[in-house]
Design a protein with these regions (language model features):
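Charge-rich amphipathic alpha-helical interaction elements
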Residues: 1-144
C-alpha cells in the first residue's frame, strides 16, 4: 500500500468520524427542539385543565387559580423564542451534518480511486516482472 492510499484511507476514516460526531450533535439539537415543543404542549394542556371548583369558592382560591393560569400562559409564550432559537440551531447542525456526509463520501471516492490506481500499478508491475523473467529464461535456454 503506497503513501497516497494510506493518506486517502486515513482521510476517509477521519471524515467518517467527523460525520458521526456531526450526526450526534444534530440528533441532540433535534432532541432539544422536540423536548421544548413537548414542554410547551404540556403547559398548554395544564392550562386547559385549570377549571374552577364547582360549589362555593373563596376569593383567595380564585386569585391563586388566576395567578397559576397567568404563570402557565407566560411560561408557554416565553418558550416560543427559545423554540425558534433551538430550531435554527438544529437546522444549522443538520446542515453541518450534511456537509460532513458530503465530505465523507468525497473522501471515500478518493480512497477508492487511490486503491484502484494502486492495484492497477501493482498489476502492471507484475506483468512487467513476468515479461522480464520470461525473456531471461529464453536467453538462458538459447545459450544452453
Amino acid at each position: 500500500m503506497n503513501g497516497l492510499v494510506r493518506q486517502r484511507t486515513r482521510l476517509a476514516r477521519v471524515r467518517r468520524i467527523q460525520h458521526g460526531l456531526a450526526a450526534s450533535v444534530a440528533a441532540q439539537a433535534a432532541g432539544r427542539v422536540q423536548m421544548l415543543e413537548t414542554s410547551r404542549e404540556r403547559l398548554r394542556k395544564l392550562r386547559g385543565e385549570l377549571r374552577p371548583v364547582e360549589g362555593p369558592t373563596t376569593g383567595a382560591a380564585m386569585a391563586r387559580m388566576g395567578e397559576l393560569a397567568m404563570r402557565l400562559d407566560s411560561a408557554r409564550y416565553n418558550l416560543g423564542p427559545t423554540i425558534d432559537s433551538a430550531r435554527s440551531a438544529a437546522a444549522a447542525r443538520e446542515a453541518e451534518r450534511r456537509a460532513a456526509r458530503r465530505d465523507q463520501e468525497s473522501a471515500e471516492k478518493l480512497e477508492a480511486a487511490a486503491l484502484r490506481v494502486a492495484e492497477e500499478a501493482a498489476e502492471q508491475r507484475l506483468r512487467q516482472a513476468g515479461r522480464g523473467r520470461g525473456s531471461i529464461r529464453l536467453h538462458q535456454g538459447e545459450s544452453e
